[in-house]
């Protein structure tokens, strides 16, 4: 993309990480538990879904996003099970790009398609409380820059949303500053869950979906903007064109 993306918003259990089936070598000198994941029954079923549905590079992105989210929160003194629900952050991070899978590919833009799939997945597993709303909101918003930085958003919305979106943003473009993650932590994460093409590979899926179904890339959305930048010859309504077509004659 030609314009810079905000690094902050660009879009705890035992060692389940060892069973994560993500491709990579064991991380050297990792602190016990720092590369672990929640091991609740819901976390395990979510991991199974992601393992089956997401390509390895996308699955690794999802797993790294959680690890970065938890580590960045820890750098701020925010502790799991005390200041936030780690399972809920895990659900958001693992499911946030399900709209880029075959299973989640609908007529909706990928963020909303993924949010809908995540909500249905939780409901099908008997989860019908506020967690469904929190997961849906976080996934649907995860490419909307700066929203979770609003002081009112941070005060009124669940902490898990901002924590998860911070981790996703870190994995997309890197930490905002050297102190956002513990020293050497990113290297240990990447040793176990390598990037495998990283976010450029993710972008290729987004573009392919948009080319196959332009309804998934409406103008002035992230998918629409990326499609326009990659394929400028394709029709792309500007804001003035949309206004010119309005039925009120303004």
Where are these regions (language model features)?
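Short, conserved micro-motifs enriched in small and acidic residues
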Residues: 56-60, 104-112
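Acidic/histidine metal-binding catalytic segments
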Residues: 85, 126-138
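N-terminal secretory signal peptides and thylakoid transit peptides that target proteins
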Residues: 1-17
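An active-site-proximal "capping" alpha-helix that borders the catalytic cofactor pocket
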Residues: 109-124
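C-terminal region of N-terminal signal peptides and the immediate post-cleavage residues
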Residues: 21-32
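His-Asp-centered metal-binding catalytic motifs of divalent-metal-dependent phosphohydrolases/nucleases
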Residues: 85-103, 114, 138-145
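Acidic/His-rich, divalent-metal-binding segments that scaffold phosphate/diphosphate chemistry
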Residues: 31-99
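Divalent metal-dependent phosphate-bond-processing catalytic cores, especially two-metal-ion Mg2+/Mn2+ enzymes
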Residues: 15-19, 53-59, 63, 67-82, ...
């Amino acid at each position: 993309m030609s314009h810079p993306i905000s690094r902050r918003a660009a879009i705890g259990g035992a060692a389940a990480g060892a069973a994560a089936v993500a491709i990579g070598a064991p991380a050297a000198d990792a602190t016990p538990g720092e590369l672990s994941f929640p091991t609740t029954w819901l976390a395990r079923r979510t991991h199974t879904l992601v393992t089956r549905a997401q390509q390895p590079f996308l699955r690794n992105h999802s797993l790294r996003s959680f690890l970065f989210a938890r580590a960045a929160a820890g750098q701020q003194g925010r502790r799991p099970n005390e200041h936030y629900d780690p399972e809920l952050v895990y659900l958001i991070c693992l499911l946030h790009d399900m709209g880029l899978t075959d299973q989640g590919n609908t007529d909706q833009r990928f963020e909303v398609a993924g949010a809908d799939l995540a909500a249905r997945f939780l409901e099908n597993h008997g989860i019908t409380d506020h967690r469904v709303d929190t997961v849906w909101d976080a996934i649907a918003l995860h490419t909307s820059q700066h929203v979770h930085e609003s002081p009112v958003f941070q005060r009124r919305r669940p902490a898990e949303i901002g924590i998860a979106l911070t981790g996703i943003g870190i994995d997309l473009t890197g930490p905002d500053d050297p102190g956002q993650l513990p020293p050497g932590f990113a290297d240990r994460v990447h040793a176990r869950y390598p990037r495998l093409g990283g976010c450029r590979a993710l972008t290729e899926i987004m573009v392919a979906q948009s080319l196959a179904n332009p309804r998934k890339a409406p103008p002035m959305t992230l998918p629409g903007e990326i499609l326009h930048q990659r394929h400028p010859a394709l029709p792309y309504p500007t804001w003035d064109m949309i206004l010119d077509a309005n039925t009120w004659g303004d």
